[in-house]
Structure formats: C-alpha cells, structure tokens
Amino acid sequence: MVKFYDREISSRLLIGSALYPSPAIMQDSIRESGADIVTVSLRREAAGGKAGDQFWSLIRELGVTVLPNTAGCRSVREAVTTAKLARELFGTAWIKLEVIADNDTLQPDVVGLVEAAQILTKDGFEVFPYCTEDLSVAMRLVDAGCRVIMPWAAPIGSARGIVARDALKLLRDRLPDITLVVDAGLGAPSHAAEAMELGYDAVLLNTAIAKAEDPVAMARAFKLAVEAGRTGFEAGLMGARDFASPSTPVIGTPFWHAVS
C-alpha cells in the first residue's frame, strides 16, 4: 500500500488517460495496468461537450480514483483557476499541479509551481506537484504543504528514462516521509523498475503505454516492472562495487587449482 495524503492505495502505478488509439483500448489498458489512480485533463472534459461526457462515463466505469490535472497551464492564475474548476467538476480536492515554463521541453515553471501550490493548499487542495528533480524546489513544495512530490525522470513524452539518477536518489534520501512519484519521461518497463529500485513510492505513466504498438500488453509489462522493482527495493539490493568479488567459495577447491 502507498499513502497519498490520508488515503491508502494498493497499486504503485498511476496511469494517464490521453493519447490512446481508441476509448476501448484506453479502458482495457487501464484495467490491465491494475492502476487505482487515473489522471484526467480538465481541458479535455470542459472542451469536449458530448464527447467529454462520454469520456467521463468510460472513466467512471473503471471504478478508479480520478486525479485531475492542470496540464497546459502556463501561469499561476491559470493553474489555480483550472484546479478550482476541476474540484467542482470531479468532486475531489486532489489536483495534479502543472505550471509549464517552456513549450519545447515542457519543463515546469518551478517558481510559479511553488506559488500555485501555496495558494491551493491554503484553499484546501491536496496537491500533487509535477516538478524537476531539484531538491531545493521539492523542499519548498513540502514547506508549501505538499505531502506528495512528483519529479520528472526526463521531459514529458521523451521516453529517455531516468536522466538524473543521483538527483532522484538524493530526493528519496532527504525526503523519507514524503510520498515520491516519478512522473514523466519513462519509456520502458525497465525505467519504471529502476525508479522503484531507488525507493520511490510510485510512478506515473501515459505516453509509454498509450503509444506502444500494443498498449494493453505494455500496461501489463509496466505493472509487472513496478512490482518487481518495488520487491527488489524491499528485499534490499546489494551495493555496487568497484572490483570483482567471487561468488563461489574457495573452500574445497582442488589443490591443483589453488594459488601458490
């Protein structure tokens, strides 16, 4: 179980609801992933009209917890307004907070992110901020009241995997009581397993599953990878070494193989 604010969730894989080839494949992929939390864009819901209503019906059929996001927002004001609309529409205080600074990299505006998090937390929101791997930013978000931090592995949709491994490890070491979720940039199941091996509580995926040749099979692969990575972390991974260490005992080695 992993704790998100005052709720305990069984699956450590969070999944997005965009970019799938069809609504049916989206539903099947989410089911196969075993995810309990699904992110949804308010912009898609608000602008979709009848199509938006149909999409929302599909999500409700899955029986999952909805995590609305502020995707596409590029200012504090826009993000705060979108979050308030999402609370009214979805009936939840949860919000995945995104404030984007750059169109090419989709890098978070960390200054605006902290400001928006402060405003929303004071207004009763439980904020899931999408941020960089910068420790100082994460600490400011914690000071703003965030109990969940979602640093990226790499730019959104890049599929590059974990680029700044040491920085993500530092976040885990310095924020032991905060729920940490790797969000964005994961492209392969092995990337998700690596994040879990670092001790992260969960990962959030969308493009890597939705854009796979077989999204449903890829959802299953990521589910297994997350489980394997977490199990490995809990089992206690041996540390890396600079030199070889024999795994076969020398006791009982034939004398003619012994080193003089």
From Swiss-Prot:
1-deoxy-D-xylulose 5-phosphate binds at residues 157, 184-185, 206-207. GO terms for molecular function: thiazole synthase activity. The keyword Hydrolase does not apply. Homotetramer. Forms heterodimers with either ThiH or ThiS. It is an enzyme of class 2 (transferase). GO terms for cellular component: cytoplasm. Keywords: Cytoplasm, Schiff base, Thiamine biosynthesis, Transferase. Its EC number is 2.8.1.10. The gene is thiG. This is Thiazole synthase. The active site is at 96 (schiff-base intermediate with dxp). It is found in: Cytoplasm.
